[in-house]
Amino acid sequence: MRIEIMIDKEQKISQSTLDALESELYRNLRPLYPKTVIRIRKGSSNGVELTGLQLDEERKQVMKIMQKVWEDDSWLH
């Protein structure tokens, strides 16, 4: 599975925060999807693209995990 996350550069999120987010996503997703590749970059808008998932249910599960990681900001500390 491949995850592409684009963060709007106008949000002024530091590279260390993006690195921490990437690490936390790997920590939560790799046990379920060992071949996961995540790319987080800054761009002109916010967006998420998931590829390599067969079932819509898998896509929903991954999005749910990503949402949980984003909302639980304990990984920032």
Swiss-Prot record:
One example of a Gene Ontology biological process annotation: SOS response
Give the InterPro entries listed for this entry: DinI-like_sf, DNA_damage-inducible_DinI-like
Instruction: Tell me which Gene3D superfamilies the record gives.
Output: DinI-like
Highest taxon listed in the record's lineage: Bacteria
- UniProt KW DNA damage keyword: yes
Name of a matching Pfam family:
DinI
* Record carries keyword DNA repair: yes
Recorded hits in PANTHER family, A to Z, give:
DNA DAMAGE-INDUCIBLE PROTEIN I, DNA DAMAGE-INDUCIBLE PROTEIN I-RELATED
Q: What is this protein called?
A: DinI-like protein in retron Ec67
Q: Whose protein is this, by species?
A: Escherichia coli
Q: What's the source species' lineage?
A: Bacteria, Pseudomonadati, Pseudomonadota, Gammaproteobacteria, Enterobacterales
